């Protein structure tokens, strides 16, 4: 039984939030063009110890994109690797990135590093992947961050138990000493793909049963559970002490298509910005508040309705993508206490 002090009780939750999440109406309706609200930017690194989640966006690095995140009212960014943002950068280049973030008034919350297959069946590729990821952990530390998001690896044809054992061994033997030395943590996103075997609660539990250290956890994304017909709220409770980061993304399911093609077919689901799919955000975010999650909730914008194709490499977001980020923030912040907006 959990200590009564482990979670916020209802009285504390209402006191901090000012209202119950269930009493709030939905926000974030569409508009032809939504102007970025000029929210006063807080200094980079603001409120790192605040006992509630920080809203952020997942983005490639560019000064313009960091500036937009701050102007749009987000508290941080989760940055993906690229030519101008990677473990091979010099100290002076990293100093410039941090200076850019300070100027924008935004905090780099964490980094993503999905490419390495930590348990690649090929010994040479496996060793190279592990060395590459250790550099990512060091890069995280050099940036002053505390978390790296990744995948759990994959071995085609191997059983779930064997893959869990392999991933746990890699973490315990290779990554944990580095994490402890640098005071960082890592976690995998539950995205169903070949090089990411641990995307169900059963697989997650098998891994964690072999890894006592809380420096390995989850980059929890409710949208992926929805399309696997797994309840993300129940999963969040089950792994409450292993949620180190959160992706905010929704899933829309088109039932008429699903009834025709089945779950093995195509076109019956798509990712949406938060609030425009079927994730129960009231229940999910209430779980995060009750377990006192204080990490980053990062909007992972994969909603094609609020985007423009073939623009990801541009230095700034197109207006339609900005609109999606703005709607996502407006929707999510109604459930979170202590917002600046």
Region annotations inferred by a language model:
Residues 79-98, 155-158:
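Glycine-rich, proline-tolerant flexible connector loops at the mouths of alpha/beta enzymes
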């Amino acid at each position: 039984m959990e200590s009564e002090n482990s979670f916020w009780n209802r009285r504390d939750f209402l006191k901090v939030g000012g209202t119950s999440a269930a009493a709030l109406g939905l926000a974030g309706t569409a508009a032809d063009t939504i102007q970025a609200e000029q929210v006063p930017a807080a200094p980079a690194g603001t409120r790192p110890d605040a006992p509630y989640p920080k809203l952020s966006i997942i983005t490639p690095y560019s000064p313009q994109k960091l500036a937009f995140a701050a102007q749009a009212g987000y508290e941080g960014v989760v940055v993906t690797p690229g030519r101008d943002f990677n473990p091979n950068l010099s100290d002076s280049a990293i100093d410039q990135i941090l200076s850019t973030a300070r100027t924008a008034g935004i905090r780099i919350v964490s980094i993503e590093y999905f490419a390495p297959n930590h348990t690649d069946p090929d010994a040479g590729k496996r060793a190279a992947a592990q060395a590459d990821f250790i550099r990512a952990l060091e890069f995280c530390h050099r940036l002053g961050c505390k978390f790296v998001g990744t995948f759990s690896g994959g071995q085609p044809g191997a059983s779930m138990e064997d893959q869990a054992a392999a991933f746990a061994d890699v973490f315990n033997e290779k990554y944990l000493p580095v994490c402890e030395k640098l005071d960082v943590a890592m976690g995998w996103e539950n995205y169903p793909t070949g090089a990411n075997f641990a995307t169900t609660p059963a697989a997650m539990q098998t891994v964690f049963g072999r890894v006592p250290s809380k420096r390995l956890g989850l980059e929890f994304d409710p949208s992926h559970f929805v399309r696997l017909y797994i309840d993300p709220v129940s999963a969040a409770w089950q792994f409450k002490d292993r949620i180190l980061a959160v992706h905010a993304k929704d899933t829309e399911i088109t039932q008429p298509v699903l009834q025709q093609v089945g779950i093995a077919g195509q076109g019956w689901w798509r990712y949406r910005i938060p609030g425009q799919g079927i994730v129960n955000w009231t229940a999910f975010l209430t779980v995060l508040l009750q377990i006192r999650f204080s990490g980053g909730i990062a909007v992972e914008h994969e909603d094609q309705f609020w985007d423009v194709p073939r623009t990801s490499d541009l230095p700034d977001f197109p207006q339609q993508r900005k609109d999606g980020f703005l709607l996502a923030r407006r929707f999510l912040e109604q459930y979170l206490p202590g917002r600046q907006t």
